[in-house]
Every structure is written in C-alpha cells, then in structure tokens.
Swiss-Prot record:
<dbReference type="InterPro" id="IPR047865">
    <property type="entry name" value="Ribosomal_uL10_bac_type"/>
</dbReference>
<keyword id="KW-0694">RNA-binding</keyword>
<comment type="similarity">
    <text>Belongs to the universal ribosomal protein uL10 family.</text>
</comment>
<dbReference type="GO" id="GO:0003735">
    <property type="term" value="F:structural constituent of ribosome"/>
</dbReference>
<dbReference type="InterPro" id="IPR043141">
    <property type="entry name" value="Ribosomal_uL10-like_sf"/>
</dbReference>
<protein>
    <recommendedName>
        <fullName>Large ribosomal subunit protein uL10</fullName>
    </recommendedName>
</protein>
<dbReference type="GO" id="GO:0006412">
    <property type="term" value="P:translation"/>
</dbReference>
<dbReference type="GO" id="GO:0022625">
    <property type="term" value="C:cytosolic large ribosomal subunit"/>
</dbReference>
<dbReference type="Pfam" id="PF00466">
    <property type="entry name" value="Ribosomal_L10"/>
</dbReference>
<dbReference type="GO" id="GO:0070180">
    <property type="term" value="F:large ribosomal subunit rRNA binding"/>
</dbReference>
<dbReference type="InterPro" id="IPR002363">
    <property type="entry name" value="Ribosomal_uL10_CS_bac"/>
</dbReference>
<dbReference type="InterPro" id="IPR001790">
    <property type="entry name" value="Ribosomal_uL10"/>
</dbReference>
<keyword id="KW-0699">rRNA-binding</keyword>
<comment type="subunit">
    <text>Part of the ribosomal stalk of the 50S ribosomal subunit. The N-terminus interacts with L11 and the large rRNA to form the base of the stalk. The C-terminus forms an elongated spine to which L12 dimers bind in a sequential fashion forming a multimeric L10(L12)X complex.</text>
</comment>
<keyword id="KW-0689">Ribosomal protein</keyword>
<keyword id="KW-0687">Ribonucleoprotein</keyword>
<comment type="function">
    <text>Forms part of the ribosomal stalk, playing a central role in the interaction of the ribosome with GTP-bound translation factors.</text>
</comment>
Amino acid sequence: MSKVLEAKQSAVEEIKTKLSASASTVIVDYRGLNVGEITDLRKQLRDAGIEFKVYKNSLTRRAVEANGYEGLEGALTGPNAIAFSNEDVVAPAKILNDFAKDHEALEIKAGVIEGKVASLEEIKALATLPSREGLLSMLCNVLQAPVRGLAIATKAVADQKEGQEA
C-alpha cells in the first residue's frame, strides 16, 4: 500500500475517532478571515479545551459517512475547519457564535451535538445557553433558596420572641 493512501486512511480514522468521542462538534467556513483572526480564534478555542483543525473535505466526508451522520455532507464544501470538544457541549458553539458576530467572514455551517446532527439554528440556540459552570451555579442557587428562606424565617421568629421578652 502506498504511503499516501496510508496517510489518508489514518486521517479518516483520526476524524472518525474524534467525531465519535466528542460531546460537541461544529463545522465552520473560515474563508475571508486573515491569519491574525484565525490565530485569535484558535487561542480562544484552545483556552476552552477545544481542538480546532482543518481537514480535507473528502476525508471528512468518508469519516462522516462511516459514523452515520447523514446531513453533514452538504456542509462539507469549501474551506472548512472543525471544532471538537470532548467535555463542554456548549463551549464550541458559544465561542464560534460570539466570534462570528464580530467577524462576519466566519460562517457556522452545521455540527454534531452528543451524537446527533445539528443544524445552524440548533447550534445558535445552543450558543445562547449558559455554560456548564453557569448551569451548576443556577442549580445550587435553586437548591439553597428553601434552606435560606427557612433560616431567615427561624431568625425572624427568634428575634420576635426576644422582642416580646424584653
């Protein structure tokens, strides 16, 4: 087997593995961004633990078909980059959507969220959600509210009884 064919097969295997292992994957068209803007985007994604890589569309198409993600083939035209996140489902969509607001040249095309193909609208909706940490803090506040209310009521009763005794 030729070295070129082996390299292509290993690239397809790498893409398949990343697609199946990632919690969230977003495909973007980066045409029109200059090197400085792409470097800035890569830094933002890297800081959030997201891998951002450019693959040939033909190799990506083979990996997508092997993983059974029908519906992504239409997004695999033109210069594309793929953002893979293994932990946070919201982070790639949020970072890319915020970057696209400031840089109109970046176009979000489609993605895969927890094993399901997602359209542009679904990714934009996901981008409006708070991060995992934000959701956990909201949950903590909701769980603390009844206990806090009970503590305030108990203190009020104690203060009232002290006022009556005095």
